[in-house]
Amino acid sequence: MLSDRQQMILNAIVDNYIHSAEPVGSRTISKRDDIGFSSATIRNEMSDLEELGYLEQPHTSAGRVPSTKGYRFYVDNLIQPHLLEETELGKLKQLFAERILHAEQVVEYTAQILSQLTNYTAIVLGPEIFEHRLKHIQIVPLNAEQAVAIVVTHTGRVENKLIDLPEGIGAGEIEKLVNLLNAKLTDVPLWQLRQRLYQEISGEMQRHTEQYEEILQLLNNSLTQEEERVYLRGATKIMNQPEFRDVDKVKDILELLEQHDQLMNVIGMQGDGLTVRIGQENQLDAIKQCSIITTSYSLGGKPVGMVGILGPTRMEYGKVITVLNHLAEGLSRMLTSQFEK
């Protein structure tokens, strides 16, 4: 456990770096009114914090920056409640005072307000993603080259999609593998289908057919969900951050933001309630320099969607968490009052 002095210094470094985007030196910290230690003492403690893995030293600077471990300690132990300004509260009140006919419209407005208030990229999973679970899938060949994939949910929703058939794939083989798919994925939420396909079924398919890759791609295409269920606002705001002004650094992030199925997996795997994933804690390489904060919203007490923020690891965690909590609570109340049956 860090000493009280180390915690004070780490808190000051994180706070300073969040607002300056510049590596922090001991002299900078010693000038703060809330720090009563000499520059030499701070320098020694910073060296210890670096050795313990809470700070890192960029090659081109004598200052330090927080590591993933440092940010994690800050979020879990040091973060202070953030008070929203009157103008920010006003935007939230205005959003939830509106009478809106469609749940999707509410969610779309939520993403817009979330991005405006935080100045980061907002990602919202609409209610439909969580409401629908697979009942069964059929793939009906039309000819040697094309088929119709039919996905039926437990709520009775039916989705049809025209797909191309791999060369040489017979109807019998397709039927056998679709039966395997139904046996393994029945009752799985639609947004999880593609992830579960690769996790649970790909190995078994490889044992059943030499055209494993072609069949896997066929099923993958059949399960692709419509993109409008992911609401994304402020996608390019990541480029406003100093650490992402290099196009090469931000390219992979922007490409990820265009892949809504990937975003559904990234946001959906966070879990219900407030979750913070920082830097290297993220599984995808594209966002290992980013943090993702999410929370769920509900309808009638049942979680039906997620709201989230993607930003640099150097994000204003206190403000983002406060905004997300306000939005999730307000969105849950609004959806419940207007759409609960």
From Swiss-Prot:
It comes from the Bacteria. Pfam families: HrcA, HrcA_DNA-bdg. GO terms for molecular function: DNA binding. GO terms for biological process: negative regulation of DNA-templated transcription. Keywords: Repressor, Stress response, Transcription, Transcription regulation. Belongs to the HrcA family. PANTHER family: HEAT-INDUCIBLE TRANSCRIPTION REPRESSOR HRCA. HAMAP family: HrcA. Negative regulator of class I heat shock genes (grpE-dnaK-dnaJ and groELS operons). Prevents heat-shock induction of these operons. This is Heat-inducible transcription repressor HrcA. It comes from Brevibacillus brevis (strain 47 / JCM 6285 / NBRC 100599).
